[in-house]
């Protein structure tokens, strides 16, 4: 079992409830608390009480849609289920991605009209959660085009792995975000993760092995064939499993283009924590950095 970030002012019982990076395993966690996290609710059940929002400062980062206060002050509506909220966030993300393909600024009025509907009372929260998912899963940052313009665009910001033409999907769309998530899962799970566990996690982000995805196309083919062919991942059958299961490990290209420290920093950014908050992984990443700094033996000399 992996270590969660160190306790910061939490009770001893909290440590017993901690789970690994990729699995939510606390049966006592409230639905409301789980609903308030988009990407992080899949990475870990709870973050330390000093979590500051995705930007690293008190409060949230990114565009704050006009009318947020009015929306928060709107008359209360009956509680929505976890499934309803996640579907609405997924719908908003899909709407923003489709609009961005035409490179036309996205108007807040269109978002409210075509997506939000009766969810106006929680629009600020839906907007924030959609922005987080866009950034950490797809590598896009949702920004307001001009102050108080109520018009938004998506910009590509996630490039932790050296990306080339091979790293782009059929439509020329970056797949770095998905790759980094899979690499993070592998590292945080002890450098190996079962395929079934990986898909259990990715489903929570709206990425399914059997469904066509707007950005990633065929996710199963992308992960188990394309990333493997590009040598970012190793994909092996686990012996003596019934039903048959497979596992993922980092491939040699990943070790050349990125590092455990860079991937750990990506995970820490998602949690809004410091890489040192995962002592075991941080020590492993440091050792990897030291090993990389040592002079490496030269390769075989070309034959004459």
Swiss-Prot record:
One GO-annotated biological process of the protein: negative regulation of transcription by RNA polymerase II
Modified-residue entries (Phosphoserine), positions: 57, 60, 64
Effect annotated for changing residue 266 to A: Abolishes interaction with EID3
Effect ascribed to mutating residue 180 to A: Abolishes interaction with EID3
Name by which UniProt lists this protein: Non-structural maintenance of chromosomes element 3 homolog
Keywords attached to this entry: Chromosome, Cytoplasm, Disease variant, DNA damage, DNA recombination, DNA repair, Growth regulation, Nucleus, Phosphoprotein, Telomere, Tumor antigen, Ubl conjugation pathway
Disease tied to this protein: Lung disease, immunodeficiency, and chromosome breakage syndrome: An autosomal recessive chromosome breakage syndrome associated with severe, fatal lung disease in early childhood, following viral pneumonia. LICS is characterized by combined T and B-cell immunodeficiency. Some patients may have mild dysmorphic features.
Region of interest: Interaction with NSMCE1: 78-304
The protein's role, per its UniProt record: Component of the SMC5-SMC6 complex, a complex involved in repair of DNA double-strand breaks by homologous recombination. The complex may promote sister chromatid homologous recombination by recruiting the SMC1-SMC3 cohesin complex to double-strand breaks. The complex is required for telomere maintenance via recombination in ALT (alternative lengthening of telomeres) cell lines and mediates sumoylation of shelterin complex (telosome) components which is proposed to lead to shelterin complex disassembly in ALT-associated PML bodies (APBs). In vitro enhances ubiquitin ligase activity of NSMCE1.
Segments of skewed composition (Basic and acidic residues): 32-43
Coiled coil: none
Outcome of swapping residue 185 to A: Abolishes interaction with EID3
GO cellular component, one term: cytoplasm
Domain of life: Eukaryota
Biased composition (Low complexity): 60-80
SMART domains, alphabetized: MAGE
Outcome when changing residue 181 to A: Abolishes interaction with EID3
Annotated Pfam families: MAGE (PF01454)
Subcellular location: Cytoplasm; Nucleus; Chromosome, Telomere
Subunit and interaction comment: Component of the SMC5-SMC6 complex which consists at least of SMC5, SMC6, NSMCE2, NSMCE1, NSMCE4A or EID3 and NSMCE3. NSMCE1, NSMCE4A or EID3 and NSMCE3 probably form a subcomplex that bridges the head domains of the SMC5:SMC6 heterodimer. Interacts with PJA1. Interacts with E2F1 (via C-terminus). Interacts with NGFR (via C-terminus). Interacts with NSMCE1. Interacts with NSMCE4. Interacts with SMC6. Interacts with EID3.
Domain MAGE, chain residue ranges per copy: 85-285
């Amino acid at each position: 079992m992996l270590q969660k970030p160190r306790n910061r002012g939490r009770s001893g019982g909290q440590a017993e409830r901690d789970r690994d990076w990729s699995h939510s395993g606390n049966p006592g966690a409230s639905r409301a608390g789980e609903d308030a996290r988009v990407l992080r609710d899949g990475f870990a059940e709870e973050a330390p009480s000093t979590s500051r929002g995705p930007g690293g400062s008190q409060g949230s980062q990114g565009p704050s849609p006009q009318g947020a206060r009015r929306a928060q002050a709107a008359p209360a509506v009956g509680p929505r289920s976890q499934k309803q909220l996640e579907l609405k966030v997924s719908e908003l993300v899909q709407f923003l991605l489709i609009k961005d393909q035409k490179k036309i600024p996205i108007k807040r009025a269109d978002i409210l009209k075509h997506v939000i509907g009766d969810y106006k009372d929680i629009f600020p929260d839906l907007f924030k959660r959609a922005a987080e998912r866009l950034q950490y899963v797809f590598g896009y940052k949702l920004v307001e085009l001009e102050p108080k313009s109520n018009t938004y665009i998506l910009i590509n910001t996630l490039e932790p792995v050296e990306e080339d033409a091979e790293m782009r999907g059929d439509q020329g769309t970056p797949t770095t975000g998905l790759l980094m998530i899979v690499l993070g899962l592998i590292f945080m799970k002890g450098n190996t993760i079962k395929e079934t566990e990986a898909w259990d996690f990715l489903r929570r982000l709206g990425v399914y092995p059997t469904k066509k995805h707007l950005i990633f196309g065929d996710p199963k083919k992308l992960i188990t064939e394309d990333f493997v062919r590009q040598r970012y991942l190793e994909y092996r059958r686990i012996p003596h499993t019934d039903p048959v299961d497979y596992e993922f490990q980092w491939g040699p290209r990943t070790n050349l283009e990125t590092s455990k420290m860079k991937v750990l920093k990506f995970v820490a950014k998602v949690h809004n924590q410091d890489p040192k908050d995962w002592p075991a992984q941080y020590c492993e990443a440091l050792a990897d950095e030291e090993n990389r700094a040592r002079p490496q033996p030269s390769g075989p000399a070309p034959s004459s």
